């Protein structure tokens, strides 16, 4: 029989104190490890990478009073500001303090209308000291006076998503009767929130660019409480088109649809890189599309400037773990070529018969990186040359796979050569060997003379449910030769 050991109360209290202190130390250590790979914020709302602190040039007085974009690579006429006057390379495009930015813009004319504002049924009133000032704040909100909220969408990474329409266009019609062409999406964040930094960054990046495959900002409205970015509403994003809520296949794009989507996506990425901007968070959820086959790239809250192409720098970890490139997951320096890895994952998800083949469903970069190495059978000779942190994961390398060959995961998909080659190139493990967007667009799959008008029938009924309703204007001879297209009889 085991004898129980009794301790006096003072000993129990001392032991409990030591146990609590040990737990606090472990939690503190865990927080330090977490902050080493994720962005954190200080009391002023500035984002700081704990693992690699460095001075922020945007804290100078001149930079905090003006918002400047980086020049285009092709600009040699001096039409744009030089890099010395632009936002410092490797920093967000806006001043870090959203409160300072809002204060500098408060004196600008807002152009508010005098029409009666209504309350927001789906949202609570902004917090305030007393209810009368809160009600006045809502009545004075220009967005609520100009737009009518008819619904909400799942919240994004950096704000609340509202579905709205102009009051002057739809009046008080039922939400279900509002035409799709009149619907807009408003991304809303609190003006004093740390998330306002990312929204202001996205607004600047989108307003700086003008491309048919990049989301366009229709209007920006600011009140004392919120900042709104209004854009066109698209039918769905690529993720909601492909998968349902239970992560089951809903529609898998056909080969010719995949080609059209990827060509437009690469055109958008090429344009961004020509403007010396990298996205850093390209994924299925950030590619928006309509039933007519047009796609746009959005959600540029993490976009960042760079000075020279293919020059890796330590910009810090950002984005989504499951779609980050190997160099970013390892904590190495990276460049704009990291966006091409994300494009390759999108193409892999569209062509694969498996659900998200490289999605490890993890938030740990190291675990996701080892999953990539195993899934793509990365050989030790395919690792970048040291010194680099990525070389520390060479113990997970595949030693039986032929270096620089097609990974078995992709080979088993049985794709046509025109599809397999660009997919393998985009998913090249070593970013030094990974091609840029311009090189990929020069490949036969995307450089074909087939026009987009020949791939789609325009003028589809508004609100087409899925891409399966698209009708190619030319027929494909076989699935293994997706690019050998012939004219339909009614087109001759």
Curated annotation (Swiss-Prot):
Q: Where is the composition biased (Low complexity)?
A: 124-135
Instruction: Specify whether Cell membrane is a keyword of the entry.
Output: no
> Cellular component per GO?
host cell cytoplasm; host cell nucleus
Mark out the compositionally biased spans (Polar residues): 106-122
| Residues annotated as binding ATP | 153-161, 187
Report the EC number(s), separated by commas if there are several.
2.7.11.1
Where the protein is mainly located, per its record?
A: host cell
Domain of life of the organism encoding this protein: Viruses
Task: Show where the Protein kinase domain sits.
Answer: 147-446
Task: Briefly state the modifications made to the protein after translation.
Answer: Phosphorylated by UL13 homolog; this phosphorylation regulates subsequent phosphorylation of UL31 and UL34 homologs by US3. Autophosphorylated.
Q: Where is the active site?
A: 281 (proton acceptor)
UniProt xrefs under InterPro entries = Kinase-like_dom_sf, Prot_kinase_dom, Ser/Thr_kinase_AS
List the residue ranges of the region (Disordered): 99-137
Q: Which family does it belong to?
A: Belongs to the protein kinase superfamily. Ser/Thr protein kinase family.
Job of this protein? Multifunctional serine/threonine kinase that plays a role in several processes including egress of virus particles from the nucleus, modulation of the actin cytoskeleton and inhibition of apoptosis. Phosphorylates UL31 and UL34 homologs, two critical regulators of capsid budding from nucleus to endoplasmic reticulum, thereby facilitating virion egress. Modulates and redistributes host components of the nuclear envelope, including LMNA, emerin/EMD and the nuclear matrix protein MATR3. Phosphorylates envelope glycoprotein B (gB), probably to direct it to the cell surface.
- UniProt name for this protein: Protein kinase US3 homolog
Q: What is the lineage of its organism?
A: Viruses, Duplodnaviria, Heunggongvirae, Peploviricota, Herviviricetes
